[in-house]
């Protein structure tokens, strides 16, 4: 049984949504589980796939607004970036709690929060990478994800507190 299936079986047997790119891993997944899942091409989401170098360097007109947000954030705040590790899980958890407390309730966000809590609880058993933005000792944004293969990294979650909207571009 896949890990995602174990998690979803706890949630009233809901079927998971799995985002996948083309390639070897998707072909492998279809070969193993294709009869149990539907596969849908989600064209509106295609613009959320970025080359690593593009996001690392933010070169060109396309990324001007991201550069502006980062500059504005840097002017307003003395901040640092910390890689996700056991020492900052509690800070990330506090940020998560504050973000969800400030967000109107809906079932999908409740499930999202449960997923984040599960991952933070099992962090040391999972191969996730991520980080957080710290301002004044407080986590104001966080992100984490997993490597799909050597060429693709999937950002699973990205949150920034409402008082720090530019932190989305920073994180």
Regions found by a protein language model. Name each.
Residues 13, 76-77, 126:
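Structured helix-beta-strand junction loops
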Residues 34-105:
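Acyltransferase donor/substrate-recognition loop-hinge adjacent to the catalytic core
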Residues 103-117:
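Conserved GNAT-fold acetyl-CoA-binding loop/helix
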Residues 130-171:
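Aromatic (often tryptophan-rich) hydrophobic motifs at membrane interfaces
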